[in-house]
From Swiss-Prot:
Motif Nuclear localization signal, chain ranges: 137-146
GO cellular component: actin cytoskeleton; centriole; chromosome; cytoplasm; extracellular exosome; F-actin capping protein complex; Flemming body; intracellular membrane-bounded organelle
Residues with the N-acetylmethionine modification: M1
GO process annotations (BP): actin filament severing; actin polymerization or depolymerization; barbed-end actin filament capping; cell projection assembly; central nervous system development; protein-containing complex assembly
Residue spans of the Gelsolin-like repeats: 27-75, 148-188, 261-307
Summary of the function given for this chain in its UniProt record: Calcium-sensitive protein which reversibly blocks the barbed ends of actin filaments but does not sever preformed actin filaments. May play an important role in macrophage function. May play a role in regulating cytoplasmic and/or nuclear structures through potential interactions with actin. May bind DNA.
Domain of life of the organism encoding this protein: Eukaryota
Full protein name: Macrophage-capping protein
Tissue: Macrophages and macrophage-like cells.
Record note on quaternary structure: Interacts with NUP62. Interacts with NUTF2 and RAN; involved in CAPG nuclear import.
Length: 348
């Protein structure tokens, strides 16, 4: 059981503190629980809140936005998310999920996959389409010499080359594959990141295996298919990757000193100095060119800034003209993910 929370005036039941999965559909601007047998079925015209309480009070709160949901419903979902997050002591890491571009973490909650139904809460339509498989399957390329970065790639052998390292994350098994011409810094980074994913995202329960080119285990072959001849690695590409990795991210400070949420760029290339993250403020880490925006919430930031995190992220996506389905991850201080930490110098 999680720490008890006050319930006076809340639209959510006391059971929100219970471990496990909780799903609500936003109906007439209110959260309505989704029965367990219907969890994994989502109406394209609606918005949902999905809360997962894991071990050791690790919580993730997802806002799922249907492709045909109204702005009113999306707004109500965001308001309810703020309320629920506050109710839980601002403990959860928050995620914005858009239909068809859900995160692997979100997909992992639904072992039978997702099903999309046309229409909305009051719709009579029941046409169903199946979402992607639920199991976590992710491939990262680890590349660079100085600004080494892990970037998600397509899950096939075409993404591989002999000059880099790759992390194949299959949930309970995490493989760090090292090309024959990869440099020692990439190999160390791949190992460290695989271990960090195990420890912070799987509570230490996943198996990490370091794989040498040519010694791939059967599980890798089962997921990726028969291994073809791989592209040769080019050491000069590491220097190009250093520059690209540095320029692919920027850091902004969020301030409401003028009564409106304003963003001030504090760094235009990574890796960033860890000292830039100040507990009194909130920050936007822009990795939108790679499909994701992060909001970091300092534990001493004022309440208005913390509660406006999702609104700030959506406004930023619009301002930068990123794709509407750009993923958003909102991280309370102390709950940073390994992928977020890699944008900073010497963050272990």
């Amino acid at each position: 059981m999680y720490t008890a929370i006050p319930q006076s005036g809340s639209p959510f039941p006391g059971s929100v503190q219970d471990p496990g999965l909780h799903v609500w559909r936003v109906e007439k601007l209110k959260p309505v629980p989704v029965a367990q047998e219907n969890q994994g079925v989502f109406f394209s015209g609606d918005s949902y809140l999905v809360l997962h309480n894991g071990p050791e009070e690790v919580s993730h709160l997802h806002l799922w936005i249907g492709q045909q949901s109204s702005r009113d419903e999306q707004g109500a979902c965001a308001v309810l998310a703020v309320h629920l997050n506050t109710l839980l002591g601002e403990r959860p890491v928050q995620h914005r999920e858009v239909q068809g571009n859900e995160s692997d973490l979100f997909m992992s909650y639904f072992p039978r996959g997702l099903k999309y139904q046309e229409g909305g809460v009051e719709s009579a339509f029941h046409k169903t389409s199946t979402g992607a498989p639920a199991a976590i399957k992710k491939l990262y390329q680890v590349k660079g010499k100085k600004n080494i970065r892990a970037t998600e790639r397509a899950l096939n052998w075409d993404s591989f080359n002999t000059g880099d390292c790759f992390i194949l994350d299959l949930g309970q098994n995490i493989f760090a594959w090292c090309g024959g011409k990869s440099n020692i810094l990439e190999r160390n980074k791949a190992r460290d990141l695989a271990l960090a994913i195990r420890d912070s995202e799987r509570q230490g329960k996943a198996q990490v295996e370091i794989v040498t080119d040519g010694e791939e285990p059967a599980e890798m072959i089962q997921v990726l298919g028969p291994k073809p001849a791989l592209k040769e690695g080019n050491p000069e590409e590491d220097l190009t990757a250093d520059k690209a990795n540095a320029q692919a991210a920027a850091l902004y400070k969020v301030s409401d000193a003028t009564g409106q949420m304003n963003l001030t760029k504090v760094a235009d290339s990574s890796p960033f100095a860890l000292e830039l993250l100040i507990s009194d403020d909130c920050f936007v880490l822009d990795n939108g060119l790679c499909g994701k925006i992060y909001i970091w919430k300092g534990r001493k930031a004022n309440e208005k800034e913390r509660q406006a995190a999702l609104q700030v992220a959506e406004g930023f996506i619009s301002r930068m003209q990123y794709a509407p389905n750009t993923q958003v991850e909102i991280l309370p201080q102390g709950h940073e993910s390994p992928i977020f930490k890699q944008f900073f110098k010497d963050w272990k």
